[in-house]
Amino acid sequence: MTKVVVGLSGGVDSAVAAFLLKKQGYLVEAVFMRNWDSNLNFDIQGNPTLNDICSQELDYKDSLKVSEQLGIKLHRVDFIEEYWQKVFMSFIKAFENNLTPNPDILCNNEIKFRAFIEYATTKLAPQYIAMGHYANIIYETSSDQKLVPRLACAVDQNKDQTYFLSQLTTKQLQNILFPLGNLTKQEVRQIALENNLINATKKDSTGICFIGERNFFQFLSNYLPAQKGDIKTLDGTFLAHHKGVMYYTIGQRKNLGLGDVPSQKPWFVVGKHLPTNTLYVEQGSTHPYLYSDKALIGDIVWRGKKTNLHLQAKMRYRQPNQDVILTWLDQNNLEIHYPQTIKAVTPGQICAFYDKNICCGAGVIKEVYFQGTKRLYT
């Protein structure tokens, strides 16, 4: 029998993925990953589960029950050190540099599709690795007649997770299975219900990858001390004080502390200046300073040819694809141009590129411009 190792999280998606693989005749084994230790990692402020049973332990119990239901072996592995060093410290460093990172993408790059794969292939020797992501893999024949995996969008466009997988290398996609790629979320729930899986009605996980729900301001304060600074309008008018520019992101409306400032429209973050620790805000969700027409993208991971310079891009999860024109600067950096202008293109976030339903690659948004002038987004 062909052996598959599936990542089991305790949620319904990975449970149905394991169920489908077994139904298709694979020899299935599962692995549960533990990647965060609240006490060891000083996760105190903003942690609503600090005095309760750790949510990861509850997820592990659900994974055990699912594996027992399906009659598959469950392994448990800790990647706490790897997660801290490769994901979380990169996450914190980005905030220190006034960027807005995406921990889910870092987590996929370094843990789920690196540390996990290394563990599974070394210890369990499967032919395939499977995950419960909403994505697809298709294969193209290269010039030397080898089959090359390409990351393709899921059928369920609302749940498609290729954005979070967009920085994986071609090597990381080798021998990967995504059993849910051609199913909708509703169909996945229905399969779980029809087969009495214990977590069929369990709500989807939210929050930071493997950490969970947190009060974001308080959570970051465990690792980034508050740095009081000025909140100003673009013309320099002082409005109030903030807790530190790294706590805010471009386009943010809530938790600005401007409730006492008279205004006709809601305030939005339109700029951040780290050297002076100044947060810039303006009124209205369509303020011109929120828009840009060019961005510099770095740390590129690209899969396939670079010949097509007219692609679509996604600068945040679930954003409708945007038409962009690429100008390659070197192997690792490019500029994207979008004359139609796009709102809240945020340094630190990932820009994923698409050619129809194929995700070609992605990079980190470094700088943002409008009509040749750099926006004060960092």
Curated annotation (Swiss-Prot):
MF terms in GO: ATP binding; tRNA binding; tRNA-uridine 2-sulfurtransferase activity
Q: What class of enzyme is it?
A: transferase
Residues the record marks as site: Interaction with tRNA: H133, Q349
Q: Which residues form the signal peptide?
A: none
Q: List the disulfide bonds.
A: C107-C209
Tell me the active site: C107 (nucleophile), C209 (cysteine persulfide intermediate)
Question: Which residue ranges does the record annotate as region Interaction with target base in tRNA?
Answer: 102-104
Q: Which residues does the annotation say bind ATP? A: G7, L8, S9, G10, G11, V12, D13, S14, M33, G132
Reactions this protein catalyses: S-sulfanyl-L-cysteinyl-[protein] + uridine(34) in tRNA + AH2 + ATP = 2-thiouridine(34) in tRNA + L-cysteinyl-[protein] + A + AMP + diphosphate + H(+)
UniProt GO cellular component terms: cytoplasm
This protein's UniProt keywords:
ATP-binding, Cytoplasm, Disulfide bond, Nucleotide-binding, RNA-binding, Transferase, tRNA processing, tRNA-binding
Q: Which Gene Ontology terms describe the biological processes this protein takes part in?
A: tRNA wobble position uridine thiolation
Which EC number(s) are documented for this chain? Answer: 2.8.1.13
Q: Fetch the PANTHER family from UniProt.
A: MITOCHONDRIAL TRNA-SPECIFIC 2-THIOURIDYLASE 1 (PTHR11933:SF5), TRNA 5-METHYLAMINOMETHYL-2-THIOURIDYLATE -METHYLTRANSFERASE (PTHR11933)
Which HAMAP family does the record match to this protein?
Answer: tRNA_thiouridyl_MnmA
Write out the similarity annotation: Belongs to the MnmA/TRMU family.
Job of this protein: Catalyzes the 2-thiolation of uridine at the wobble position (U34) of tRNA, leading to the formation of s(2)U34.
- Protein's UniProt name: tRNA-specific 2-thiouridylase MnmA
What does UniProt list as this organism's lineage?
A: Bacteria, Bacillati, Mycoplasmatota, Mollicutes, Acholeplasmatales
